[in-house]
Amino acid sequence: MLTLENVSLNYGSFTALNGVSLHAGQGELVVLLGANGAGKSSVFLTISGIHKAAGGSIRYGDKSLVGMKPSQIVANGVVQCPEGRKLFPGMSVLKNLMLGAYVHRGDGAANRQRLEEVMALFPILDQKKDDPAGSLSGGQQQMVAIGRALMGRPKVLLLDEPSLGLAPLVIKQTFEVIQRINQAGTTVLLAEQNAFAALKIAHRAYVIESGRIVMEGDRESLMNNEAVRRAYIGA
């Protein structure tokens, strides 16, 4: 469904991604594991069209995403929830959510239906829909960020470090929601440092270091890999 082949990315003279290849099939939940600065966000920003790949191919089904505008990529069904949430803190929860539907702004009925689905997934947001997003807790702000991405009607959802800055219980709840989104039919590509939480819900995973994919496998093989356990699970 989403396939990267030999993707490279440069920031000036610095090589951020070097020959990255990965695949997320229909209905899969695929994790991209890596330490801070390993290249996870660079992968997502390149898929989303924010950064221009220096080489390689990025395909969604039979379409090439290379050269598409970010809004076109969203309209085609590949939607990112960025690291750090990137909300507008002074705007209401509802307005933040509706920004995610911008590329579908001419389809009011479908947007209202989608909003109902998001509120059903995150009932607390319905209660706080008129509150400034910046007044919410970190976990609630992450709900807004995920909900905003869902308003874009993703077929492939890119989640960049959703556990960042959250308490352990909130991380558990967040990952349960991510699993529910996937089980409802959305393909998920999840970038995380929290290997223990991420691998528990993953079908497959890749490990990225210094802009290169250095390992891949199913959940069980990576959970039991000694190097992965030492580096990311602390065991």
List each model region and its residues:
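ABC-type ATPase nucleotide-binding domains, specifically the catalytic core motifs of the NBD
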Residues: 12, 30, 68, 93-113, ...
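Helix-to-loop junction immediately C-terminal to a conserved catalytic motif
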Residues: 48
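ABC ATPase C-loop
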Residues: 149-150
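Conserved ABC transporter NBD signature motif
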Residues: 56-64, 76, 110-115
